[in-house]
Structures are given as C-alpha cells and as structure tokens.
Amino acid sequence: MNLLFAWRYFKAKKSANAINIIAWVTVTVIAVATACQVLVLSVFNGFEDLVKSLYSSFYTDIKITPSKGKTFTLTPDQLQSIKQQAGIYAVSMVIEEKALLQNADAQTIVILKGVDSNYVHVSGVPAKIITGEFNLGNADDPTIVVGSGVQEAIAVNADSRSGSPQSILTVVLPKRGGGISDPTEALSEGNTKASGVFAIQQDFDSKYDITNIDFIKQQMGLGPDEYSASEIKLTRTADLLAVQQELSKLLGAGYIVQTKYEQNTSLYKTMRLEKWFIYAVLTLILAIATFNMVSSLTMLVLEKQKDIAVLQSMGAFLSFKISPGK
C-alpha cells in the first residue's frame, strides 16, 4: 500500500513553488560538492604520489648527518655495524660541499656530491640519466654527472656519441686548513670530465652534481674516515621508524638520523596542509548544502500537513512519506 501511494504521488503533476525549487537546488549542490570532493582529493593524491616519487629518486630512505659541523668520522667497524642492522639494504658514504664549476668561460655554483660505488644501490639518480651514463670514474681520473639545469647553465656536453669531445670541467673546492692570509691556499682546483646528465626536478637539476668521493676527499684534504653523510636504502619490508630508532641508539648523540620525509620537512608539511585545507573547504560547502536540505524538508512537511492529515484520517500510518515536489 505504501508503494502504491508513493507511485501515485510520483506520477502526479509537480508543483513549482519556492520550497521545491530550493530542495532540488540543494540536492544538486550536495551531489556536485560530493563529486568535486572525490575528484579533487583523487587528483591531489595522484599529484602527491608523483611528487613523492620524484623526490624519493634523490632523497634516500634514511640519511645520517653530523649534529655539529660539516663532517663526521665513521670508522669501518661502525659502518659495518650499520650495515648489519635489520632492514638495511645498502649504505653509501657521501661528501657534500658547495663548489664552483667552470666550463671554459662559463661558471656556476653547485652542491657537489662525492659518492662511493654503493650509491647506485641507494639512490634513484642513476635511473634518471638522460644523456651519457652514470659513471663517476676514480680519484685519479674522475668524471662527473651534472643536473640538466647545470648543463644548460654552462653548456656542458656529456654525450660521447655526439661527435664533439666531452666537456672538461674545473671544480673549485674549499680546502681544509687553507691559509686565510693567502686565498689561493684555501681553495683547490681539479679537472673532471662530464660523463652524464640527470633530470629529476628543477630543484635538483639546477643545484646538484655528482662525482667520485675519493676525488673530493683528495681535493679537500679530508681523512679516509671523514664523511658528510651516510645515505641508506631499506628493504621493502623494513619499518622506517623502527630502523631510524635503532640507528639513533647505535650511533649516539653526535649524529642526526633522518627519514626521507624529515629530510624535506617543509615540502611534506605544505602538501599535507594543502590537502586538509581543500578537504575542509569542500566539507564546509557540503555541510551548508546539507543544512539547506534539512530546512527545505522541514518547510515541505509544514506545507503538506493537510495532505498528511487526510492520509492519517484514512488510516495511513505515520511512516508514510510524501516525496518533495508533489
């Protein structure tokens, strides 16, 4: 019987008073707001995953840096202890320093990373080579991989198949213990050949270059166990926070152990804030539309009190409902 009454009112001629118009507009707003919320958050999640994948190509799962100064000492025994920790896949030792990079008359300031042979196992940079190859040479015959932004800035040729000779770049680095009275003693110069170009994201491509760690140590006068950082890749099943805590306990207070999210905190915080802001705005729109719907239904019930009274006098139960617009 309920369905028969509902079908009769459904087929009846619709009224076009203000209450019904407001009700249908509200329904439309709720539907559109919900669809927009799902669509925008889906797009934002996809964009967030893309940004994370790009930054993960450069930032490793865990990075160890000194709590004071630019370098720290890590003995072979300490390094072996790190490698033996559960969940660690590979460890690469790194020297980072600002350097002047010259190609003939062109020059630019870069952050030069000296890395060891394990770097290919911890970083995604080797997979982002667009010209040449990821080859860093050795201390006596070093080669360098430059970012695409640096390549454009100083016109670096790193392609051995181009028919033109690969660029020989001059690297100027600060030297430990250089005389302050004589500026020339505070700097060291070395030549290296361009072997490849990587492209990840503009922030990295225009700032970072990568070369052999022994070459940088030789130029800067660093000891065999001195490093700027240790970059670590974990196994797929490893617990990132658990490994971070274990390494912090192992190394002590003289070292900072950061996850890939902590290495670029501002980026991830900004992305989270943007996501929650979008969610809050769309939820507010949805809440306002919902309140409008409740108000419209309340006015609709008041408008149809006569119809409800007639149905009740005919023996209808209170559970009978009359749909909007009848």
Language model: regions and residue ranges:
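Mechanotransmission and gating elements of multispan inner-membrane complexes involved in transport
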Residues: L173-K275
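Transmembrane alpha-helical interface segments in multi-pass membrane proteins
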Residues: T298, D307-K326
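Peri-transmembrane interface segments
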Residues: A16-W24, R236-F291, L300-L302, L311, ...
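Amphipathic alpha-helical repeat scaffolds
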Residues: A33, A289-S295
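Membrane-interface junction motifs in transport/secretion proteins
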Residues: F44, E48-Q78
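Juxtamembrane alpha-helical signal-transduction segment immediately C-terminal to a transmembrane helix
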Residues: V40-V43, F47, V51, T270, ...
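A structural signal for hydrophobic secondary-structure junctions
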Residues: Q84-D209, D214-M220
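N-terminal Sec/SRP start-transfer signal
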Residues: M1-A35
